[in-house]
Amino acid sequence: MIDIKKNIIEIKKNILNLELRSNRKKNSVTLMAVSKTKTSEDIREAYEAGQKDFGENYLQESIDKIQDLSDLDIIWHYIGKIQSNKSKLIAENYNWIHSVDKISTLKKISDYRKNFKNKNKINVCIQVNIDNEETKSGINLQSLENFIKETYDFDGVNIRGIMAIPMYTDTYESQYKTFIRIKNIFDNLVNKGYKLDTLSIGMSSDYDAAIAAGSTLVRIGTSIFGERQK
């Protein structure tokens, strides 16, 4: 039996310790609970344990859960592949998107979002394919700055930062090395004057290295909810 509350408490304690070890400010890292394939009851249990940010991959499944849990002030993050014809649903239901890699799709989302009454701009992290893997989504590094510039007149979105899923490796040293590369890219953009504050890197297997490198948001599912259902 998975003890969701216990897992969340332990992970948040770990994050605080990692912040301290890395000379980071307390609570400078946001925990996103990745709840894809998990039930509304699982999410409610996590919420009652103090978890507010949840990430979903599968649109229709997530819309059902968002409706089921509309009585809770959850911050919903979309982290799945974005289909252009689903842009309106994403714009209507989510607070954040972490998987943007097409300017045309982002323009659609922006246009839909600004037409919804009582909706703030949707927060966006641009997905970067840091290792140029053919099997992963994300824009290449050479295109990143121009991509951001193209969003300047998109009134329905707020570009907050970048998201990356590096190539898998099982050693802390290699994980940290890759995350530092991403952090340097992020810092370079900030130093150029881009108003970015979110670096979405790190998952269950590598969030310690990600936090040491400078992550501001980690996406954790398995360590909270257990192995996901097939």
Predicted regions and their residues:
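Conserved alpha/beta-domain cores
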Residues: 1-205, 213
